[in-house]
Amino acid sequence: MEKYLEKTKVLIEALPYIKKFYGKTIVIKYGGHAMVSDQLKEAVINDLVLMKFVGINPVVVHGGGPEISRMLNKLNIKSNFINGLRVTDEATLEVVEMVLVGKVNKEIVGLIEKAGGKAVGLSGKDAGLIKAHKKLAKNPEPTGEEYLDLGYVGEISEVNPEILLTLIDKGYIPVVAPVGSNGSGEFYNINADEVAAEVAVALKADKLIVLTDTPGILLNEKDENSLLSKATIAEVKELINRGVIRGGMIPKAESAISAIKRGVGSVHIIDGRIAHSLLLEIFTDAGVGTMLTP
């Protein structure tokens, strides 16, 4: 009997959140170990489908770093990173597009369909969704040039959400691969955290949720108990300046700051290694990970 009462408590706890977010759009940046483990994949997909069935509009922007790295290794193409961003030459760009658009995107769509949902996969090149231009990275070294060329790495100029709004209206879960175009035939690899943030802004999303391989933002990266459960954008900026936030967490934090400044209600950086972390973050009082607010 107790286990049934426990299930009832879970449903009752979720009810006010279901009411609160009914009809709202939530953008999910899907990446990290949750894309590698079959068990976690299944949990994420089921979370997305459940969200849709209770009236929330999830929009997925996915990464694919581990898959890209594996394919590049197979082809003996070296990977280099600057400030957490992959340097992308022409050969790397071909692999990035093949993996993100041709493999990862289609797999996610197939899993959503298998779980009973409806999904459409697209990249930023489709229907003029993401316009981009070349991105330069600030040189992390004190000597040499101030900015470094990252190759075919893009910075977003504009997001046209029309195709996403149409898909949402028709009951589909849009699944977006982070590749964009400059409108003149050149394509760019774009950091998925940046794409998720810009899509969230364009859709006026209530939340942006970022799945990571850490519990959230840590004050000491060697201590998972040093989790910062809530933070303002001013506090996050200070942590970046102090070097507490670094590496791959920098683009996540900077994208979160940008999204909140331009109207996204809150950004949640959560532990994608926990099964059903999406549901725990949205539908429970405690939540998981770090919540960033204005």
Swiss-Prot record:
Gene Ontology CC annotations of this record: cytoplasm
Residues involved in substrate binding: 64-65, 86, 189
Name of the encoding gene: argB
Annotated EC: 2.7.2.8
This protein's name: Acetylglutamate kinase
Catalysed conversion reaction: N-acetyl-L-glutamate + ATP = N-acetyl-L-glutamyl 5-phosphate + ADP
Species of the source: Carboxydothermus hydrogenoformans (strain ATCC BAA-161 / DSM 6008 / Z-2901)
Keywords from the named record: Amino-acid biosynthesis, Arginine biosynthesis, ATP-binding, Cytoplasm, Kinase, Nucleotide-binding, Transferase
Compartments, as annotated in UniProt: Cytoplasm
